[in-house]
Amino acid sequence: MDNNNNNNNNNNDKNDKNELNKIKVAIRVRPLNSRELGIDQKIPWSISKDTISLSQNPNINFTYDYVFGIDSNTIDVYNAIAKSIVNSSLNGINGTIFAYGQTSSGKTFSMRGTESIPGIIKLSIKDIFKSIEDSILEKDYLLKVSYLEIYNEEIKDLLNPTISNKKKLKIHEDIYKGVVVANLKEEIVISPDQIFALMNFGEERRHIGSTMMNDSSSRSHTIFRMQIQSTCKQNGTIQMSTLTLVDLAGSERVSSTGAEGVRLKEGTHINKSLMTLSKVISKLSEEKTQQHVPYRDSKLTRILQPSLGGNSKTAILCTITPATTHQEESISTLQFAKRAKRVKTNYKINQVADANTMLKKYESEILELQNQLVKSEEINSLLRNTISTQEISSNNFKLGMKRFNDAIIGGSLINENKKKKKRRNTLDPSYLLKDKIIKKKIRKSENQKIKKIKNSENNISSSSSNSSGEEDDDDKDDENNYSINQDDKDDSNYEDDDDEDEDDDEESDTDNEDDEDNDEDNDDDDDDDDEFKDNLNLIEPLDDETIKKIKDLDDSLGISGQVKVKREDLDLIYEELEENKKLIEEYESTLELLNNQLDEKEIEHKELLIIIDQWEQECTNRENQNQELLEIDQQSKQSIQQLNDKLLETKQQSKQSIDQLNLQLIDIESESSKNKKSFENVLGVFEKSYRLAERLEDKYFTKEIESKKQIETLANSYLQLETTYQQQLNINQQSQQKIQSLNNDIEQFKLVWVPLKDQVNGYFQENQMFKQYIIELEEKYNTLIDLQKEVEQNYLTNTLEQQRNDQYQIEINQLTTEYNNQIQQLESTNQKLQTQLYNLLANATQSTQTLEQQLQTSKQEIDTLTNEIEQLKNQYDIIRVDNDNLSKESLELKQILLSKTQQLEEQLSLAQQQKGNIEIIQQLESIIVDNQQSIDQLKIEFDQSQQDNQSIKQSYNQLESTLTLAQSENQRLLTENKQFITSLNEIKSLFNSIQQQKETIQLEFNQRLQSWSLDSEKYKEIISTLEQSNQKSIESYESKSLEFQEKENQFDSLLTNYNQLFSKYNDLATSNESNRLEFDQFKKDSNQSIQSLESLERSLKSENDNLLQQSNLLKSQLESIEKQKQDQLIPIQLELESKKCELSKLSSQFSEQTKQVTQLLISVDQYKISTNKLESQISDRNEEINNLKLKAIEINALKEENISLKDQLTKLKKAPKSQTDREKDMIKKELEKLREKFNAIDAKLKQAIQDKQTIQSEKQSLEREIKDLKRSHTSTETELDKLKKTHLAADVKSKDFIALNKSVEILTKSQEQLKSTIIELESDLSKKNIELEKKQEELVTLNQDKLEKEKKTNQLESDHSSATIKLENYENQITQLTSEIIDLKSKFQEFKSESESNIKQQEINLKESNDLNQQLTNDKFELTKQLSDLKVEFDKSKQLWSTRSSESNDTIKELQESIISKDKERQLTSEQLVKLTDQINLKTWEYNDLNSQCQQLTKTLQNVKSSNEQQEQSIVSLESQTSAKIKSLELEISQIQENHRLEVLELNRCKNQLSEKQTLMEQDNIQLNERIIQLLHQKTKHENEILSMESNIIDLENQTKELKSKIETAQQDFEIEKNYHTGLNETNTTTIKTMNEELTRSNQTIQQLLFKISKLEQTSLQTQQQQELQQATISAQQQKQQQLADDQEKQQLYQKIKLIEKELESTKQKNLYITEQFTLKESEYLDTITDYVCKEKEFEKSKASLKTSATKIQALNDIIKKLQEEKPQQQPVVKVSSSQVVNQNGQPIKSILKKPKLVIIPREQLQQPPQFKELTLSTLNSNDSNCEPESVSASSTLTSLQSISKYIGKRSEQTTLEHDLTSSTLNLPLQQQNKKVRLVITKNNKTSTDNLTTTSTSLKSKSSSNGENKENQNNNIIIKNN
């Protein structure tokens, strides 16, 4: 069973870990203080469930696991956060709870609490012991407790403060325990009272101070840690866990707290540690792998390392003050909590399978203890050996001294000037060798054992040594060095001196740090040293000759007794000298050691000074380099500015040149009709200017490239400087490490101060003892006064007094001698102590002076020293005051004693006179002796105290001198700091200048952007005007072209068949060329469209990729959600299974309880039956009572009869005896009968009383049953209420609750029915009781009348009264119960109303969810609609495109393949769109799947609810279930609620995400639609442009190529500019980043320096420099805020710049496109102008020729007429072949018309009709008849005449001309045939005329057909002259 339980617990813990692996975060808002209520009365925070937000700005929302308002209790907080952690800590899971917040926000209140309101710590301890009591049978527990505080970054043990005072506690790492504080006291704990006592003990020693914010603010972080070790009794498995409860000190502002001095120092340390904590949590919340987390920056984070993101289940309680004044601090705490909420932990069960590990641990501890014992034994043996060696050496020395004495007694004299041999020769060297060998062996054994111990420790904790701190490594290095030095020293030769051996011994002693050696080294004075040296100079070894002489003298002279005595004295003196000499040698050795150490430290100091100088030089070099870099940056910026200025100048020049060119173009357009050469010159100028612009741009780009190279070189140099800077930082770190090692040395020197402090404390204790002695003396003085009073009564004799006085004087003299001896001894000891102190102080002062000169970082220690000195000052002042008081008191005592001694002498003189009372005198004498002894002791002690005071004064003077030195050093450091501050200010000024430069650059950039935008607007305006002008010209051109076309058709009709054929041929050639050019143009356009489509495809692909990524993200999120839900469903399923088991149990219990209910119903029925029986019994009893009444009447009658009989008896007495006897017999018989009747009546009465008692007992039983029923009813009601609460929380649907309500109503109805029946029964009972009472009263009245003397009646009355009292009590109880039932009903109704409101809210939520689903479906439907619309639009565009393509296919059949390819490409795009739609459909399917999953979840919830319904049905019968099970069910249901709430939140989040993604999809679709529309517009534009540009392609190929090349160069230039700008932006961003990093570093350095300055200035300039520091911190914060604002502005500007760049790119593309079109149109326009000019000239020539021809024709007609008149008989002319039509220049018209030309006539010229001036024909030569006639085309003349007649408007003249012409041709004479015209004569006249007409008509028809073909070929009318 236990294994199963453990497995279940493990599974539950795993599930909890999967669900709750994040840190639990709760917020608690405390109520307002009295101080805060006076300032502001409104609370700006609004709290709703798990969120907290600002009421003014609701956008600032924060959601957490729990949020507790002002009215919250600590018990609720504990149950929400801490209880689960405490319970899991008992199962082997580590747990931590800590409170975080501002000062005076209620952290200690919530953690510690008070006596009335316990905090989290007390509640957790109580729960731990409760759970231990519950599980004692299963497990054994071992609890250990430790309590520490972190005060000013120093760890202090609150349970053992002496250790923390003696030495610093260090942090280590252990494999099993983790991060551990070494030498921390751990108390084994049995009860909670013991823990509370330890906590109180620690709280008394905790640092607590008062500030402006809080009267008792905690000035340190406290960590209460409990180690819980539990072992299972069956398996033996061990579970280890630690529960850490942390009370953090609050973050504080100096301005709000008003901290000064020590408080400011404490506040800075607190803020520093909290900053590191926030850094750690921010790093952990980022969820990045392989990142550095700064745990080691603070001791708090180092200790709490496993709790923060490690093997621990943690919870954070963030407390907030609701006042408006602390709004910023509260927001910062909330942000901290938000970051902490994202931190994940990896806690696990710390379980050990076997007890082997513990055994190993204990074995290792035993080994350590054994090793320590071995060490102690070896040390003892060493001491013994040293003692033995000292004894041997002393014996040898005694022998030498004896010899020396013999020599002195012999009378020999010692020559001091002689050379003396060394003392070593006189001694026996074997002893020294033995000593050396023994010492070496002992040292070797010690070293070997130490190494073994270290190896064993390393084996035990192999991993802990690797992960231990830097301090441990330093200690190990020191130990290794020590052992190496010892080995090196031990390996020295035997021939070394004794002094060196002694040095080695003393070095080992000093390394072991024994205090006894320090005491022994400093025992004697300097004067004694000089005397001993003189004696030693005397006591040196003698020569052999002198010794022989001394022996001879001894032999010759005799040794007298006096010499023996002197020798003994000399022996004693020599022994003392030996001891003194040893002490001197040891002292000298210690001095040498100290000197060596001082030399080493001086060397180290020099090295450090050299390093510091190097560092300072490097810093100066770095500063110089930085300045050089800044100068280079400035130069580069200036060069960039110059380049930009040049760019601007070039751009302005180019703009000016372009403007000038535009003006010139306008002028040229106006003057184009006049001068063509000027136009060509302008083109040349334009090309030259363009070439100049290109050259300037090339120069600019070369300069730009050079500047880029310069910038790259500067960047490389900057990187090199950064590397050098990092190297120097590493060097600085190494120097800091060395400084830390020196600090450790200082700490070791500080240990020297500890015995001094102990001595001072001893002196203080001795002073206290003196005070006690004085008090005792005062008491004794009072006794003396009493004795003196007795002495006044008794007069003593003078003789005895004199004798006593003599004895007293003798004793006083003895005491004075003893006193003087003791004083001398004390003075000697005092002098020794003073010398020791002086030496120690001198050494300490030397060491501190050297170290203080070495280190600048020893400021804190100087401060601590100053504090200690201040304490010593205070102590000294106290001691001085005490000593002054003592001196005064002693003087007063002396005076009193003198006065009293005088009085005693007077009294003794009187006593001598009287001579009596000897015994009294003896007693007085003894008292006086005692008093004198006490006085002597007091004098001795007083002298000692004076001596101690003198020594303390000396030490105080020395300390004052050290203080002065420290203050001078502080002043020096202050000056250095001021210099540093000035340098910082200079850096700040430089930084400000850099920022100003940045701002100027940004302004320039903005100005450039504005200028670019203005230029773009100007270009747009120009383009719009040009487009308008082009449109107008095109419209006019179209109108005039129509007119011109008509004229052209008329002109073409006059041309001959030859010209027609030639024109056809030319038309075919031109059509081929135009088709080719159109094909090329179409290719280009198609390529452009393909490129645009490819770009579209790319964009669509990118969008598709984004959509795919989003879909993948959605899928991953959905999968994660599904996994989470599955993970959550697993515990729910397990819980369901457990609940099924419980339901089975509950069903069994339900069945049992149904049985109980049935039994109760049966009992109720029985009760009813019993009541009926009782009613029947009561009726029977009433009948019996009536019978009894009748019997009572009979009894009265009998009494009356008795009375009558008595009367008769009296009468009969008077009668004779016989009669009396008879009568007596008769009376006896009657009396017996009466007695029998009376007995029967008594029996009946007894039965009635018994029946009454039985009725009362039955009544009581019924009352009990009723009470039980009521209790069960109340219990069922309470259980039902609880079950309703639990099920209402679990239920969601209203139907379930309605069913519950119905069941509850049924129960309530049944209960009400039961109540009504009970009330009815009670009313019946009360009625019957009343009737019984009445009847009983009647009985009582009867019995009182009849049987007053009988006791039974009294008992009945008393019973009846008690019964009535009980009934009354019962009635009162019933009334109370009814009132309680009414209250319960009211509560039940309230609960009903609340439940109904909850149901309504749930229904509203369901409706909202349904609405959301509907909205989602509507959005889907809308999306599908939009997609369908897009498809329709796409199809329409397809159709349009197909129609246009079909129209183009009619004219250009050769381009069908390309169009088909385009159609294929469009199909591909459509397929892509279809794919997109498919993807959208897939996403909709995925969304549907999500909905289906949600529905499945709802189904599962419904199933759960159905199971809950079953539970409800089962719970209706759970009336007698225990409260513990109900509590467990409540907890489980609350967990389900939390899970459900989390699921709902997740679903809402998913919905929100889906809605956001849908909105994004909609936006994307809108963008796609816009893009499609744009593409359609572009297509239409392209089509129009294609149709408009087909005719103008031939002459524009070269120009387009040139323009393309120019455009490509311009694009390249633009890309280069863009890259340059991007490079500039990147450089700017990099520089900004670097500057920000430098700013942060400088801020950090500034903070550190300000912190150091604040520490240094505490002693001298507290107030002024604190204000400066405050201002500096405020300015730093403002700078930080400004930096943040600047960064935000930079980001915004960067985004704006990006947008502007995009817009510029788009505008540039548009401009390029417009310029291309403009150039094309311009070239076309110029070509049309040139053609038009040529045409005009030709027309003028043709007009002149026509005039001449007209004159000639008239002449011909006249000639013809003449010829007809002269020779009418000649035959008519059939055919007239006309000669060639010639211009004025003699050029034939045929040759002119062969050349096809494109003529584009502007509107202004087309508005006026063409003016025909002359029309010339060649004259007819009629000289020779034999010459060949010139061929003249009649059709040309006809067409020309027809055209003229059309323009003139005289159609009638045409017929006449034709008729005249025909007639003239027919009537030509035969004589003129051979001259100018060749006449072809035919027989019939009609045929000739017909042929002429047919030819003319055919010409006309052909010309018209040609014109139609031309119109079909080109929409733009082009005139072709053949």
Swiss-Prot record:
Comment, domains: Composed of three structural domains: a large globular N-terminal domain which is responsible for the motor activity of kinesin (it hydrolyzes ATP and binds microtubule), a central alpha-helical coiled coil domain that mediates the heavy chain dimerization; and a small globular C-terminal domain which interacts with other proteins, vesicles and membranous organelles.
Biased composition annotated in UniProt, kind: Low complexity: 456-468
Species, as recorded: Dictyostelium discoideum
One GO location term (cellular component): microtubule
Location(s), subcellular: Cytoplasm, Cytoskeleton
UniProt-recorded name of the protein: Kinesin-related protein 4
Positions of ATP binding: 101-108
Domain of life: Eukaryota
One Pfam family from the record: Kinesin
Function field: Microtubule-associated force-producing protein that plays a role in organelle transport. Its motor activity is directed toward the microtubule's plus end. Cooperates with dynein in organizing spindle assembly during cell division.
Induction, per UniProt: During the developmental stage.
Annotated Acidic residues bias: 469-480, 488-532
Residues annotated as domain Kinesin motor: 22-343
UniProt keyword terms in alphabetical order: ATP-binding, Cell cycle, Cell division, Coiled coil, Cytoplasm, Cytoskeleton, Microtubule, Mitosis, Motor protein, Nucleotide-binding, Transport
Ranges for region Disordered: 448-538, 1887-1922
Annotated GO biological process: cell division; microtubule-based movement; mitotic cell cycle; mitotic spindle assembly
Principal location class: cytoplasm
SUPFAM superfamilies xrefs: P-loop containing nucleoside triphosphate hydrolases
Keyword Transport: yes
Family: Belongs to the TRAFAC class myosin-kinesin ATPase superfamily. Kinesin family.
Coiled-coil boundaries: 562-1712
